[in-house]
Amino acid sequence: DDFTPEGNHRWNTNKYYKKIGNVAEVISKIGKDVTPLGPSILGVCEIENRLVLEDLVKHELIASKHYKIVHQEGHDRRGIDCALLYDPLHFKVLAYKSIELTMPDNPDFASRDQLLVSGELMGELIHLIVVHWPSRRGGESKSRPKRIQAAKLTKSIVDSLQKQNPKAKVVVMGDFNDDPISPSMKDFMNAHDNNKD
């Protein structure tokens, strides 16, 4: 692993806390031009474990938000997960689960789970899906089937929620590792531009 003392980045305690500080600083500035409260919900990716999140939410730059954490260990071989940080004054978690991404033609495939969190945002039911789709490692076209499979999983989660309630409010957030015009987004997530001139 690159982020260990023996790894390529020669990771150590000082670098770790510097990174925590940098991320906390960015979070502390999000949305400040709109509201002094900052974000009520925040989907995060590349999470190694819950301790990292606990260190992050305790950082002095964001500790006053009293962020709570939704995190479950997933199936990624490197131990990299998705998580949700939320302000308990604005968001109440009702249920959550991690949903494994599989490849039918590759039983050994392991990637980040998709995190589904259902809750009340300012009293209104909302469903949040935090994703970190497979990277483009090995080239965009070679890795495309993995992102398409991730898109199919995300879409199936959305469809399931909207089957239960056609007016369900669903937000998908995270790192898609793809472009808005990529097949995973256009053809499988059915994303399109509603802002046509």
Language model segments and positions:
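N-terminal, active-site-proximal structural segment of metallo-dependent hydrolase catalytic domains
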Residues: 1-66, 70-80, 151-152
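Active-site His/acidic residue clusters
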Residues: 2-3, 124, 129-143
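Flexible glycine/proline-enriched surface loops and loop-helix/loop-strand junctions
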Residues: 7-8, 113, 136-139
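A Trp-anchored, charged/polar loop motif used as the substrate-binding/catalytic surface
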Residues: 21-27, 108-118, 152-159
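Loop/turn elements at helix/coil->beta-strand transitions in domains of secreted/extracellular proteins
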Residues: 37-41, 64-67, 122-126, 165-170, ...
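Active-site flanking residues adjacent to catalytic metal/cofactor-binding acidic residues
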Residues: 45, 131, 174-175
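Structured beta-strand-rich core segments of catalytic domains in phosphoester-bond hydrolases
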Residues: 47-127, 133
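Metal-dependent phosphoesterases centered on the DNase I-like endonuclease/exonuclease/phosphatase
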Residues: 147-197
